[in-house]
Amino acid sequence: PLLEGPAEKIGHHLKFDLEVLRANGIHVKGPFFDTLLAHALIAPGMKHGMDVLAENLLQYSTIKLKDIAAPGAKKRELDTSGVPVEVMGKYSAEDADITLQLSAVLKRQVKESGMEKLFRTVELPLLPVLADMEFSGIRVLPESLEKASVKVGAIIDGLRERIEEAAGHPLNLNSPKQLGDFLFGELELVKKPKKTKTGQFVTDEDTLSALAPQHPIVADILAYRENMKLKSTYLDALPRYICPRDGRIHTQFHQMLTATGRLASQD
């Protein structure tokens, strides 16, 4: 009843807490205050971890989870299953105390920054919406991805054959060095091409897009890259993220990760 009542709920990365509680049948209702979001709004270029904020804003050194937990199965994961209850209890109590202290400081700073209206009317209301989206997940049909991957793979093979036929010899299109040597050394599309600090020719998308009108092979190379990215980043990768429990992908949405304000998706 307390978590579903009208009292303000304060947390650091509160979205994570909402999802954990919801997975255990507890639906937390607002109002909310997230110290991580507050600091990210007023100081976007700085680190927003609780340990850092405690040092900078409270002049307090917190208990570090890495000092009491064991390494997890995955990189950057920590396993707390073997931590004694009294040790974990002290860590958790400090976590709650520091979050409350940080909220008092950050509420004042958000107000002084002139961004309180933005924070209260846009960022905080968005938080539970994103938590719901992450918890619900995105339905994905693996068989559809597999069919699309085969189709795009055929397009990639066709583009590779056409490019190598036009070049007159085999060409590793995934090697920026080979590609640069071919376009600027062999074809000499530009008299004074740009080079990287290591001396290689620059072959990024902007450079090739500007050269596309000069030679049809450049347009094919751009199309090859676009389809390769589609296949490797999405069609072949997404099935690995499907949760076996419900057949959905549960990503993480970040509302403060980009300077432009757009949502960023991770995992």
Enumerate the language-model features and the residues they cover.
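General beta-strand structural signal in soluble alpha/beta enzymes
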Residues: 11-12, 30-34, 64, 173, ...
